[in-house]
């Protein structure tokens, strides 16, 4: 794939042989973001685990101190008092079977996160084949299957993100916008990395953090020293 002139200019700013510390990396990710929109900054973390084994899964959620810069639309599956609680807490969509039908029949996906009360999981389970591949299925580990829907919504709106391994043992997560500046991006990055390090499975052997790369939406990858991610 041929890259544009701006991308080629950005690539020249990055030393491909160097492992940057987090502060240097965040400064560089801003310099290499040349798009006319406020690019998202992403972290890509390759782990020394095997996601094919159940005891080597890495999955969880963390509240980024400065959020992601993105307005997150929350759908809540709940009934009765819990539905009212969700509406008061600022959920964008609240419902039960009628929302399942809407998703199934209209291919409707105008939401970013799904929360459900435990009693609704039998209903939500019917959407497993469509929500699962999109990473939208509610999950207790991520705090999205809960009776405390108000807290779940507040955390998500405040910048809570879910992290999980893909099939190639890499975690991909947004950590903010280029406009955040170095300090906020570093704060968010360190918070994410601390959560991933704490989530290390007991069955994982050898080096846990294989590689860490940060990039803006349209920018080149910048390698971060795995030994310095908490600094």
Swiss-Prot record:
Signal peptide: none annotated. One of its GO terms (cellular component) is large ribosomal subunit. CDD domains: Ribosomal_L1. Pfam families: Ribosomal_L1. Keywords: Repressor, Ribonucleoprotein, Ribosomal protein, RNA-binding, rRNA-binding, Translation regulation, tRNA-binding. The keyword Repressor applies. It comes from the Bacteria. Belongs to the universal ribosomal protein uL1 family. Part of the 50S ribosomal subunit. Binds directly to 23S rRNA. The L1 stalk is quite mobile in the ribosome, and is involved in E site tRNA release. HAMAP family: Ribosomal_uL1_B. This is Large ribosomal subunit protein uL1. It comes from Acetivibrio thermocellus (strain ATCC 27405 / DSM 1237 / JCM 9322 / NBRC 103400 / NCIMB 10682 / NRRL B-4536 / VPI 7372).
């Amino acid at each position: 794939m041929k890259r544009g002139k701006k991308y080629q200019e950005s690539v020249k700013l990055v030393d491909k042989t160097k492992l940057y510390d987090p502060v240097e990396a965040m400064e560089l990710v801003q310099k290499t973001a040349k798009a006319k929109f406020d690019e998202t900054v992403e972290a890509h973390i390759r782990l020394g685990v095997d996601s094919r084994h159940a005891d080597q899964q890495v999955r969880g959620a963390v509240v980024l101190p400065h959020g992601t810069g993105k307005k997150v639309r929350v759908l809540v599956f709940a009934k009765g008092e819990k539905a009212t609680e969700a509406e008061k807490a600022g959920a964008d969509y609240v419902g039960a079977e009628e929302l399942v039908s809407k998703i199934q029949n209209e291919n409707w996906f105008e939401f970013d996160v799904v929360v459900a009360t435990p009693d609704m999981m039998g209903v939500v389970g019917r959407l497993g084949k469509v929500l699962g591949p999109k990473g939208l299925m509610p999950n207790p580990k991520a705090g999205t299957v809960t009776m405390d829907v108000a807290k779940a919504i507040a955390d998500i709106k405040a910048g809570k993100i879910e992290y999980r391994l893909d099939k190639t043992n890499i975690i991909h997560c947004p950590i903010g916008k280029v406009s955040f500046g170095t300090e906020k991006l570093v704060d968010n990055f360190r918070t994410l990395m601390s959560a991933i390090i704490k989530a290390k499975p007991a069955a994982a052997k050898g080096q846990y953090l294989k590689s860490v790369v940060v990039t803006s939406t349209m920018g080149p990858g910048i390698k971060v020293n795995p030994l310095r991610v908490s600094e």
